Amino acid sequence: MLNDSKIAAYTAILQEELLLATGCTEPIAVAYCAAKLREVLGGKPEKILAEISGNILKNVKSVVVPNTGGRRGIDAAIAVGIVAGDADAELQVIANVTEADVAAIQTYLDSTDIRVTCPETPCLLDIKLTGWREGHHACVRVANNHTNIIYMEKDGNILRELPVTGNAEDNLQDKSVLNVQDIITFAETVPLDNIRPTVGRQIEKNTAIAAEGLQNSWGANIGSTLLESSQDWATQARAWAAAGSDARMNGCEMPVVIVSGSGNQGITASVPVWKYGKLMGADDDTILRAVCLSDLITIHQKTGIGRLSAYCGAVSAGVGAGCGIAWLRGADCEGISHTLENAVAMISGCICDGAKASCASKIAMGVSCGILGYDMYAGGNNFRPGDGILGDDVEDTIRHVGVLASQGMRETDRVILKIMTE
């Protein structure tokens, strides 16, 4: 059993990470910053300078911003935030946009000078918007986390100023307490009332958007394409996860519970585990514990990687889902550890080239590797310590992945952004 302080810490991590968001979180962060700019300035800016970090540009460029009439990109995210955003709603800042607002977005874009630049910054997530209106100006800056305002100013009067660091974990729960053994123990023994409000809502919201992704045409329809070829349980688990991303990346307005700042990761960590559990006849409480395990394994991996990087986050969530499914299949700590290491050995290095329709296919691939990772273990086959980036044990391997992503792939990130913006 875990002590009370560790149970409280793990519960707090889930409460902090499993947040409800409408739309891909990077354009939503831009819209949130824009809504706050309008609030500070006292009206809609007539001119805007947007200073945006490369990783935000990458993740906003190709994804459809919900409630904008199918528009994509930084300008659309700024415009919807200015015209109709509710800053108090944070990650649901554009959840209540009306049809009249959608029409007003184009009018605002046509009449407003919006200039976008990409300055050097120590923060991978960095959004600074400066606006001018009727002789006044204001500035709002969000950094490190999607709703973390570190600076606000109007007409030279500083309203808020926090230190700028490049650490996305600043002011968040200490995640150094996470380890695979304790995650499993927590998932197996935590009182269900501790996790039902967060993980239960995650299952409800994320399976709903996955169903929408299968019922209607969204993006490249990866989910429904997978189901055309097979109906076995593994394909269904992959397809349902991919379908949620099909819808989310292509402008579906249904909210999603995120993990590590990402809706795709929130979907991937939960939906395939839920689907497998349902197909195998597991009860709802058991599925809740399995998704909890998947979430925490995903968060544990992502702590070293960072919220935004050149390393595809859906891969980490796919590995987490594989571990959750392995637990439902009877795996203990040894089996789950080998599942993670086997999967990481297969798929590490998959790049993030921005939020877009093809994320759904990467999700399917990540979940597939997670499932295969346990199948290998169950058959007595495992990759060994020292095979590539695999460490002496699972915690060592997770650290290696963090170093690979946060340090080794920095130049990869710059090259991806250069290709995307040329």
Where do the PLM segments sit?
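Acidic-glycine-rich active-site phosphate/pyrophosphate-binding loop
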Residues: 1-11, 44-58, 232-251, 283-301, ...
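A structural signal for small-residue-enriched, beta-sheet-centric alpha/beta enzyme cores
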Residues: 2, 21-25, 55-59, 63-66, ...
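Glycine/charged-rich beta-loop-alpha catalytic/anionic-binding loops adjacent to active sites
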Residues: 10-19, 56-65, 247-258, 298-308, ...
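Conserved phosphate/anionic-ligand binding catalytic regions in large, soluble enzymes, centered on
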Residues: 20-36, 254-271, 312-316
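Hydrophobic alpha-helical bundle architecture
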Residues: 38-40, 66, 276-289, 299-365, ...
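Flexible, glycine/charged-enriched surface loops at secondary-structure junctions
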Residues: 44-48, 89-94, 116-117, 193-199, ...
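Signature of multi-pass transmembrane helix bundles
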Residues: 109-251, 416-422
